[in-house]
Amino acid sequence: MKIRTAILVGTAVVLVVAGTAAIRPAVPRRGGTPAPELTNTSWLNSDHPLRLAELRDRVVLLNFWVFTCGNCTRTVPSLVAYDRKYRDRGLTIIGIHTPEFPPYAGEHDKGNLARALVRQGITYPNAQDNDRHAWDAYGIRYWPSFVLIDKRGIIRYAGYGEFHVDDGDYREWDRRIRQLLAE
């Protein structure tokens, strides 16, 4: 009886995982795929909704994050450093603030997000992705996640996880940014 129960539970888990994967769109997580357009309508630190089509000839780094995520907030100084270092050389960083579901800790509130941006010294544009349109379009699963888009609008690199100014991951992302800026 225990074996039968284990088989049934195992089968149920496989079906749930397979069903979840089937519901989610097949989305680029590797280079060579055109970047899905941003359809977010609520923006902070930008006087209008940004569209990737407007940013051709610029390298774009998308940062999927949420202000209650410790890994995300510890990565912010690295992103602020990239913004200061490369903004005038052709890099645009866009934060995509994607709250958890169900609403948690006021993450869906635009005022709370605005205060978090000020508190963390973030001046680059941020889209509020409460409905997870960008999150789903890019196939994101973890906070923080990053997508690096070249000047032609093609995804070249994607990854996730916390990194800090001057650690190995920071240097690797820095190298990739410089490479795309030089193309």
Model feature map: region roles:
Residues 73-120, 128-136:
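Structural microenvironment flanking redox-active thiols in thiol-disulfide oxidoreductases
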Residues 122-125, 139-147:
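Structural micro-motif
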